[in-house]
C-alpha cells in the first residue's frame, strides 16, 4: 500500500469465505494456466470451464486478451506493464476465489517471480499452477493469431519464446502435455480437482 494511503483500512466481511464455499458446494481456488502463446492455455481453460459449469460448479475465466480490453487496457507490453498486468489479474482472481468461485486464468505469465507474486496474493492453498507444456515448434505451427510469423519477421518485438524468455514452471501442481487432445486434458484436470477435494465427485 502506498504511503499516502495509510488511512485506508481493511473492512472485514460479515460473510466468510467458508460460508460462500458452502453455498457454492465447492472450494474457491485459482487455476493459473501458463505456457507459450499457442500452447493451448485458453482452449483448455475454456473447455474445463464448460465441463465444470455442466457439473454445477461456479466458475469464471480470465483470459489474457480479454482483460486488455478493459481492466488492463491502459497497459502496453513493457516489462513493467506486463508485471502490472499480472498483478491486477492476480488481485481480481483472489477476490473471485474469496467469493467461492473456481477461477481459471489463461496468461503466458512468462516469469516465475510474477507467478509467485500471484501465488502469495491468492494463498498457497488456493493457487494451482497449471503448466500447458507445448514445444515452441508446435506453437509456431499453430500460430492462431499470426504472432510468431510477425516476431520472426522482426515486426513484433519482445515476443515470448522468440526474443523474450519464458521461464517454465519448475514444479507446477499440474503439468499438461499440450499436444494431447483437449478432452484428455480436461479429464485429467477434473480428476485432479476431485482428488484434491476442490469439487465433489
Curated annotation (Swiss-Prot):
Keywords, in A-Z order: ATP-binding, Kinase, Nucleotide-binding, Phosphoprotein, Transferase
Lineage top rank: taxon: Bacteria
Pathway: Sulfur metabolism; hydrogen sulfide biosynthesis; sulfite from sulfate: step 2/3
One Pfam short name: APS_kinase
CDD domains for the chain: APSK
Enzyme class, spelled out: transferase
Binding site for ATP: 35-42
EC number: 2.7.1.25
Entries under Gene3D superfamilies matching the protein: P-loop containing nucleotide triphosphate hydrolases
A single GO BP: hydrogen sulfide biosynthetic process
Keyword ATP-binding: yes
Family: Belongs to the APS kinase family.
Known role: Catalyzes the synthesis of activated sulfate.
Descriptive protein name: Adenylyl-sulfate kinase
Gene it is expressed from: cysC
Amino acid at each position: 500500500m502506498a504511503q499516502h494511503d495509510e488511512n485506508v483500512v481493511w473492512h472485514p466481511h460479515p460473510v466468510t469465505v467458508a460460508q460462500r464455499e458452502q453455498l457454492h458446494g465447492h472450494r474457491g481456488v485459482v487455476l493459473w494456466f501458463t505456457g507459450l502463446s499457442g500452447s493451448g492455455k485458453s482452449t483448455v481453460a475454456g473447455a474445463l470451464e464448460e465441463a465444470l459449469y455442466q457439473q454445477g460448479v461456479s466458475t469464471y475465466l480470465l483470459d489474457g486478451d480479454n482483460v486488455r480490453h478493459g481492466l488492463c487496457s491502459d497497459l502496453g507490453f513493457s516489462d513493467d506493464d506486463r508485471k502490472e498486468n499480472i498483478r491486477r489479474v492476480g488481485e481480481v482472481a483472489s477476490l473471485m476465489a474469496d467469493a467461492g468461485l473456481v477461477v481459471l486464468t489463461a496468461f503466458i505469465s512468462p516469469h516465475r517471480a510474477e507467478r509467485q507474486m500471484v501465488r502469495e496474493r491468492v494463498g498457497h492453498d488456493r493457487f494451482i499452477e497449471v503448466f500447458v507444456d507445448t514445444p515452441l515448434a508446435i506453437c509456431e505451427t499453430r500460430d492462431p493469431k499470426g504472432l510468431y510469423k510477425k516476431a520472426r519477421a522482426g515486426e513484433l518485438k519482445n515476443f515470448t519464446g522468440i526474443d523474450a524468455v519464458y521461464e517454465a514452471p519448475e514444479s507446477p501442481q499440474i503439468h499438461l502435455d499440450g499436444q494431447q487432445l483437449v478432452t484428455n486434458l480436461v479429464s485429467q484436470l477434473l480428476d485432479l480437482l476431485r482428488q484434491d477435494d476442490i469439487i465433489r465427485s
